[in-house]
Regions:
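C-terminal edge-of-domain segments
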Residues: 113-162
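A short, Trp-centered hydrophobic/proline-enriched beta-strand micro-motif
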Residues: 14-29, 67-72
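Positively charged, polar, low-complexity stretches
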Residues: 11, 30-36, 59
Length: 162
């Protein structure tokens, strides 16, 4: 089945809404060390929001407008994405209010006014998204003479997330 870049992007946003965890790192900081972070969104596109703590090493090392890279794997390993963008600390109270939920609240003793609460915003610019077909199916196709490179070419796309 052929997939357009737009279809792959839609699959990415849908998978992110259900799985939420990705690995987030700053370009050129700590040799690109990435941390698992829970992404929250407000629709079918970015930005990606992350609740964290002011004592998180990423927050402490974050100059405003830092280049960031995130890696995402859907829970069933059927979709992968490498996301690039700009990461900002953005403690916007209106956004905190909109995104606040019981799972976030569990991390902050002081609630929305906890002095350790920090909110990060990833303005995603582009991503490379891969759909992963069943490796068993790929093996069967190869036995039947199907070129796996040709079969896979419509399952990867570079998409603009702005």
């Amino acid at each position: 089945m052929d997939h357009t870049p737009r279809e792959l992007e839609e699959k990415f946003w849908k998978a992110l809404k259900s799985d939420r965890t990705l690995m987030l790192g700053l370009d050129g900081v700590e040799d690109g060390h990435a941390r698992p972070m829970t992404a929250l969104t407000e629709g079918e596109s970015g930005p990606l929001w992350f609740f964290t703590s002011v004592d998180n090493a990423m927050v402490q090392q974050l100059p405003q407008g830092s280049r960031a890279v995130a890696a995402f794997v859907a829970k069933d390993h059927d979709l992968f994405a490498s996301i690039k963008g700009t990461l900002h600390r953005d403690d916007n109270r209106a956004v905190v209010d909109r995104l606040w939920n019981p799972f976030v609240a569990a991390w902050y003793e002081g609630g929305k006014d906890d002095p350790k609460l920090a909110l990060l915003r990833l303005d995603a610019e582009d991503a490379e998204i891969w759909l992963n077909g069943s490796s068993m199916l790929a093996g069967v196709k190869m036995l039947l003479g199907v070129d796996p490179k040709q079969d896979y070419k419509d399952k990867v796309a570079n998409v603009d997330l702005r």
